[in-house]
Curated annotation (Swiss-Prot):
<keyword id="KW-0687">Ribonucleoprotein</keyword>
<comment type="subunit">
    <text>Part of the 50S ribosomal subunit.</text>
</comment>
<dbReference type="InterPro" id="IPR036919">
    <property type="entry name" value="Ribo_uL30_ferredoxin-like_sf"/>
</dbReference>
<dbReference type="InterPro" id="IPR016082">
    <property type="entry name" value="Ribosomal_uL30_ferredoxin-like"/>
</dbReference>
<keyword id="KW-0689">Ribosomal protein</keyword>
<dbReference type="InterPro" id="IPR005996">
    <property type="entry name" value="Ribosomal_uL30_bac-type"/>
</dbReference>
<dbReference type="GO" id="GO:0006412">
    <property type="term" value="P:translation"/>
</dbReference>
<dbReference type="GO" id="GO:0003735">
    <property type="term" value="F:structural constituent of ribosome"/>
</dbReference>
<dbReference type="GO" id="GO:0015934">
    <property type="term" value="C:large ribosomal subunit"/>
</dbReference>
<protein>
    <recommendedName>
        <fullName>Large ribosomal subunit protein uL30</fullName>
    </recommendedName>
</protein>
<dbReference type="Pfam" id="PF00327">
    <property type="entry name" value="Ribosomal_L30"/>
</dbReference>
<comment type="similarity">
    <text>Belongs to the universal ribosomal protein uL30 family.</text>
</comment>
């Protein structure tokens, strides 16, 4: 069974690149402070790498 990750957007997307905005939209992160839970996959890890300076990631219980 794969683990789940809690992902929280803690910085805005105003000065971000189109690639970063697209990754945030795909994850469902559209407002500062929004938290989503996603299954940990290699594709998700790639999106998180693009947004690494804008988000915090924790393992969900």
């Amino acid at each position: 069974m794969m683990t789940n990750l809690n992902i929280k957007l803690h910085h805005g997307l105003v000065n971000s690149t189109p690639k970063q905005r697209a990754a945030a939209q795909t994850l469902g992160l559209n407002k500062i402070g929004k938290t989503v839970t996603r299954e940990d996959t290699p594709a998700l890890r790639g999106q998180l790498q693009v947004l690494r300076h804008l988000i915090t990631v924790e393992e969900a219980d």
